[in-house]
Amino acid sequence: MSRAMSLKAKIRNIAKQKNIPAQVILQNYMFERLLVRLAESEYKKKFVLKGGMLVAAIVGLDNRATMDLDTTLKSLPLTPEAITGAMQSICAIESDDDVAFEVGTVTPIRDDDIYGGYRMMLNAKYDTIVTPLSIDVSTGDAITPNPVEYTFSEIFDDKKSYRLWAYNIETVMAEKVETILRRGVFNTRPRDFYDTYILATTQEFDKALFTEALMATAAHRGTTEQIADIPTIMKNIEESAELHTMWDKYRKQFAYAEKIDYTQIVAVINNLIE
């Protein structure tokens, strides 16, 4: 059996166990191999993890699938040259996993969000398998109070782990809730709702610190006044037929969300921000 076939067999087994598409497992495995190298590099403290990859690490891949990686830079300029140089250095670190990384393009992020950054494309190569990876890099986020060092378990062997700097859970939730309030009924990202719900209902967190982080995030993003009328915003979100429909589609798409009703999510968010 070739190395590629052997890896695919291991991935299929885990995909079956966790009820997750095999492509998601493959993508996350390749991200893991990159992050293991980051953990061994001089840039360990300079790339702070956030977003879906961090949520998946906290609640488990079987409770949150993700296909991308989000980071915030600390003590490193947010320029294509600095990002490329750092990533080339990280990818050059040798490991016994036989994965090779090819650094690709760095382009400005032009998403519908209010803060910028860059998207870096890489290819992860293992035998005949080539997996494209996308990493979003931003800077200047309000992390309240500070990043925390977090232990990430490896996909194929949860006795093996690596440590990286990441957002504290209160800041993760604050960014999600600020986005929900800011976008209101125009939100097109059901994962914002899911992430807020799953973190608030399964993890321990400091509610006062969450509130402080929410205020700091809104101040940083310039949305303090925009999200000030929380009762009206939440009433509109609760009554939005479009958001109900969007959530129902998400539930059908992901097994881990199928038993969560939209009204439960709204109740959890209301409880967070009351």
Feature-to-residue mapping (PLM):
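Structured mid-to-C-terminal alpha-helical surface segments
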Residues: M1-F47, A56-A65, L69-E274
